Amino acid sequence: MLLALGPKAWPKLSQFKPLLRISGGETLHRNSRHWAGQGQRQGPGLRTRLLITALFGAGLGWAWLAARAEKEQWRQQQRTEALRQAAVGQGDFSLLDHKGQPRCKADFRGQWVLMYFGFTHCPDICPDELEKLVQVVRKLEAEPDLPLVQPVFITVDPERDDVAAMARYVQEFHPRLLGLTGSTEQVAHASRNYRVYYSAGPKDEDQDYIVDHSIAIYLLNPDGLFTDYYGRSRSAEQIVESIRRHIAAFHSVLP
């Protein structure tokens, strides 16, 4: 068209160039907004996509936690079964408590029991382990939904740990800590039932000696069955959590 009008007409058309550019630009811009608007209406909004992503992530998290809990429960069941097959604590015992009253295993039926074997002349390990045991008992006492756990201390040194010595010793830890002692044969029998090793060392010039022995805290359920044990490396918090799980599992299978 410009060629048909000739060069002389071009200056007259120059005044329309801005209008053409502006008009075309506006048209293109409006079309772009129209297309963009159509694209936004066709798909979910940003909030919807974020909500879907959050729900999906929460679902994955819940599934992971459920799988982890199931795996932990399976491990606990396997451990409990292995401990039962070890035949620990299945026999009875006959001892005297720190008040001079006879005690046997049946006296603790219906209670959860934490039991530790040691001796009152122990310089450090026994006091530390008994203090840890008492911490566990106190933490569990602070939870009203949980049953009381009975702490028990059985000596492996009956030669020195008579009733009076046990009474003096246990009062330093917890008012409900029960000390048990007996004759050499009675203590040996109870120790064998729980697979506890102990051996008195040589006496020094003051007739003092150290007793080497197994270091473990035993957990018995209300049926009197050995349920678990905890070595020195286990903290009070770890033991409390383990006992919580055992209590929950025990009550879940009650008729």
UniProtKB/Swiss-Prot annotation:
Record-listed Cu cation binding positions: 122, 126, 213
Primary localisation category: mitochondrion
Transit peptide: first to last position: 1-41
Annotated GO MF terms: copper chaperone activity; copper ion binding; protein-disulfide reductase activity
Mitochondrial matrix topology ranges: 42-49
Keywords of the record: Chaperone, Copper, Disulfide bond, Membrane, Metal-binding, Mitochondrion, Mitochondrion inner membrane, Transit peptide, Transmembrane, Transmembrane helix
Disulfide pattern: 122-126
Keyword match Metal-binding: yes
Self-association state and partner proteins as the record states: Homodimer. Interacts with COA6. Found in a complex with TMEM177, COX20, COA6, MT-CO2/COX2, COX18 and SCO1. Interacts with TMEM177 in a COX20-dependent manner. Interacts with COX20 in a MT-CO2/COX2- and COX18-dependent manner. Interacts with COX16.
PANTHER family xref list: ELECTRON TRANSPORT PROTIN SCO1/SENC FAMILY MEMBER, PROTEIN SCO2 HOMOLOG, MITOCHONDRIAL
Protein name: Protein SCO2 homolog, mitochondrial
